């Protein structure tokens, strides 16, 4: 998550700027949505979340319901995921990519767009036969892995 995708870009939680994580993550998506919502309150996302903290799921749900504002946010997220992922695919050429974290719960509304945009960023040879799947353990993967290691050592 800490490869650079923007020179002098958004501040990341690591203290650097322009990191992939600052753009292609649930946190990055929420930050972008909140920024856009300050100037555009005429949308389904704002109506549904006014007065409470925004979650990535809210954005994906509103996009699935046809909210143009949220669909633009999903396109933004998909583009940055595809940019970073395309760079990694070009270097590593894996057979499978497992996407975890908050964006993994988005479903086809995001992943269909990521797959389409990957053609702009990855070599066609690395996309042949590539599988992109959501992590089955979700956000608990780290905790489950740590528990597994603890039990087996």
Role assignments for model-derived ranges:
Residues 4-11, 16-153:
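ATP-binding/phosphotransfer module of carbohydrate and carboxylate kinases, centering on a glycine-rich
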